[in-house]
Design a protein with these regions (language model features):
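Flexible "arm" and connector segments at domain edges
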Residues: 1-80, 84-126
Length: 126
């Protein structure tokens, strides 16, 4: 599958779901819980890994270790896909246009985090 829009991706995953008659199990509460569970599985892949604070060269070395570990990358991909699939199921059930939701949220973040106030800053704003 080549590049795909969010809408097309949503149709792709909902067809998979609907072909198996699973929509009847997709209550928003359960889908939101599934998103959290899958996100926790993603977090678990990074648990106990060293994290360099501030030293850019050390951070770059750590990133290279992640990228070179193909088994870890495969597991990360699977968990990211699970999170996104459940997000797409939830947007379908609640009839949310994810394209519009993302655009709206980015506009809100642009106001909250103006470039001139946050770019090249090392510390989080108060």
């Amino acid at each position: 599958m080549d590049e795909i829009t969010i809408k097309a991706l949503q149709k792709f995953v909902t067809k998979f779901r609907d072909d198996r008659d699973w929509r009847r199990f997709h209550h928003p509460k359960d889908l939101s819980m599934s998103i959290a569970i899958e996100a926790a599985e993603l977090m678990e892949l990074f648990q106990w890994h060293k994290q360099s604070m501030g030293d850019r060269k050390e951070m770059e070395k750590e990133f290279k270790k992640y990228i070179q570990d193909q088994q870890l990358i495969q597991r990360i991909q699977e968990e990211l896909a699970d999170v996104l699939i459940y997000c797409l199921f939830l947007t379908d059930v609640l009839n949310i246009d994810l394209n519009e939701a993302i655009k709206m949220k980015i506009k809100m973040n642009e106001k909250k985090y103006p470039i001139q106030e946050v770019k090249k800053r090392d510390k989080k704003r108060e």
